[in-house]
Structures are given as C-alpha cells and as structure tokens.
Amino acid sequence: MNAETCVSYCESPAAAMDAYYSPVSQSREGSSPFRAFPGGDKFGTTFLSAAAKAQGFGDAKSRARYGAGQQDLATPLESGAGARGSFNKFQPQPSTPQPQPPPQPQPQQQQPQPQPPAQPHLYLQRGACKTPPDGSLKLQEGSSGHSAALQVPCYAKESSLGEPELPPDSDTVGMDSSYLSVKEAGVKGPQDRASSDLPSPLEKADSESNKGKKRRNRTTFTSYQLEELEKVFQKTHYPDVYAREQLAMRTDLTEARVQVWFQNRRAKWRKRERFGQMQQVRTHFSTAYELPLLTRAENYAQIQNPSWLGNNGAASPVPACVVPCDPVPACMSPHAHPPGSGASSVTDFLSVSGAGSHVGQTHMGSLFGAASLSPGLNGYELNGEPDRKTSSIAALRMKAKEHSAAISWAT
C-alpha cells in the first residue's frame, strides 16, 4: 500500500459514504446515478479506498448500506430508467399513497462460494466386470492424494445407462452356475421335467379332434326294416315328419335314422336314373348309325336269284352282263335290247352294274324320275321289299345246306 491508501483508511467512513450517496447529485434531472463524484475522481484513490473500507473495514451499518446500494445499482441496469427512483434512498415519501408498480424480480448475483479446504472424500466407482466375489471393499488412492475410490465388484454384464443395477444375490449366481455347468447324463432338470409332462403338438391336435367329433356306429338294418322303408319309398320319396315318425315306430328306429336312410336312398335312386339315361342315349346312337351291310356272296346270290327279276328271266339281257361267261360287248351292243325308251334301258344297266343291290336301284330310280320306272322295265316287273327279304333268307338256307353237305362228304 502507498501512503495515500493508508491516509484514506484513517478518514471517517461515514463522511465517505455520505459523499457517495449524496442526494444533491441525484436530484438533478437527466443526471446518471453513477456520477456521485466528479469525472476526474471516479477512478481516484478516494473512491476506491472508500468502497474498500466500507466493504471490508467499516462497521456493520456501513456495510449494510453499502450492500443495499450495490443492489440498487444493479437494478437500474436491468430494468431501465423507470427504476431510478428506487436507487435514491433519501427521496421524501409523498403523503398520499401512490399505486406502486408490481415488483419485478431482481436477479440474484452469483457470489463466489467459499470453498472449504480440500479434504479426502469417498465416491463409488464401478470396477471391471466379471470379478470374483471376494466380499471386501478396496480403497484406491488417487493421484492427487486427497480422493479415494471405493471399488464395488459386479457380477453381471455391463449395462447401458438407465438400466437398474441389480445387487448380486444367491439366486442369480445359482442360476448362472446351473446354466454353465455340464448336465449329467440321465439327469433331468426342472425345465426338462416340465417339457416332458406337456404333450406334443401332434398329440394335442389328435386329442382335440377326437373330443370334437364322436364317431357313430354304422346302423345295420334288418330285412323287415328295409322292406318297410322300401314300401314307403315306393309311395313317396319325401315323407313328411308324421310319416317318418310312424315308420320309426313300426321299424323300431329313431326318426333321425329314418330321415338319413331316405336321404341316402334318394341319392342312390338319382344315381341309377342318371346311369340309365346314359345307357339309353348310348344304345339309341349306336342303333341309329348301324347300316345293314351285305357280304359279297349275298349280293351275288341276290343277282343270280330268278325271282329278283321276274318270270321271263331267260330272255333278260341283265344276266348276260352279270354272268362272267358271256362276253362284255353283248351288253353294249345296240341290238341286245328290244326297241324301247332309251332312259329305261340306261336306268336298267346302271342299276344292275352298279352295286348290284336294291339300294342302287332305288337311288337311280329316284334320280331319273318316276316316269323312267315304268311298270315294265323292258317287259319285266320289279319285285317289292318282302321278296328281297325272302330271297336273302333262302340264300342263307342254301348256304347252310351246302355247308352241311360238305361236312358230311368230308367225313
């Protein structure tokens, strides 16, 4: 300290504070409340020494006034020019009470907290996991020599932040040991016993299916019961409830069994009807498309039969064309036919030399018209359908006789 500072400490503290909080300098309008001293003395030794003396070396009253002044000095800086009146503590109060503005919260100045002397303190520190439980707490000395860490062993995996810390107990250790230990052969644990007691899914499904449906024994009807049921079915396929009950009483059956029998009987009847209709359709189409085909021997026998042409078969030129012994030009000679219509002669030739059957004659006759088929074809009449049938039967009989004669001659 210099000499001026020592002299300033010897001054009266009350005079210095009165000069600082002088109401004369604050009563002027527009003047700053911080200008209690002249501009040259603001940072002088007198102001600084007075403030230091009031804070550290003054009496209690001076320190209280100085502390209140410090708060009032901070208030105008925060709230603005409207709070200047609160800085002046010596402003006379008016006689009439004025409405006071709502008190504004004053920010608390953060005072530096005095730190106590450094003392060694204990704090919990989580040690490395998977340490064997030893039941002892280890005290570690820090590098500074005034702090120590209390190491607590853990028995589980490292947990993330926010997970609750589980204290080690005998159950957890026992569970881990039983899980990590090798199971002996033939020894079942509690979980194995529980799983063996529970049924498998397949067995459970089978038991549920058996419980869900009851298999009914097949009803065997006697001949008397079947006869009575068939009698009623012949009358009606759909008996009503009253008829079924009467039938059940006669046959010593239940009404439900009678109803089921009629359902099955109707299904069987529909199946038979459908099968019968299919058979009828098949037989109808098979008979409709079958054609009476004659063999070559039958055709030759019909042509050689004299009754096929008429009485005067010897004078007819047709056998000359059919029989292979006669020459073919005899059929084509112009003098072979007696004078007659050319259309009738052409029709006669085509009908005989075509297929040699009645089908060719009928078609060719219809082709040339009814006029060509005159009652006498070259003086000969054509026999009807019954003659052809009898001729075919006669030919078959002749064949049978020839066959029997050949067999008898061979023996």
UniProtKB/Swiss-Prot annotation:
Residues 94-106 have a biased composition (Pro residues). Binds DNA. This is Homeobox protein aristaless-like 4. A motif (OAR) lies at residues 391-404. InterPro entries: HD (IPR001356), Homeobox_CS (IPR017970), Homeodomain-like_sf (IPR009057), OAR_dom (IPR003654), Paired_Homeobox_TFs (IPR050649). Residues 75-145, 184-219 are annotated as: Disordered. Gene3D superfamilies: Homeodomain-like (1.10.10.60). It is found in: Nucleus. Keywords: Activator, Craniosynostosis, Developmental protein, Disease variant, DNA-binding, Homeobox, Nucleus, Phosphoprotein, Transcription, Transcription regulation. It holds the Pfam family OAR. It is linked to Parietal foramina 2: Autosomal dominant disease characterized by oval defects of the parietal bones caused by deficient ossification around the parietal notch, which is normally obliterated during the fifth fetal month. PFM2 is also a clinical feature of Potocki-Shaffer syndrome. Changing residue 7 to F: Risk factor for CRS5; results in gain-of-function. The modification Phosphoserine is found at residue 200. Transcription factor involved in skull and limb development. Plays an essential role in craniofacial development, skin and hair follicle development. One of its GO terms (biological process) is anterior/posterior pattern specification. Belongs to the paired homeobox family. The lineage of its organism: Eukaryota, Metazoa, Chordata, Craniata, Vertebrata.
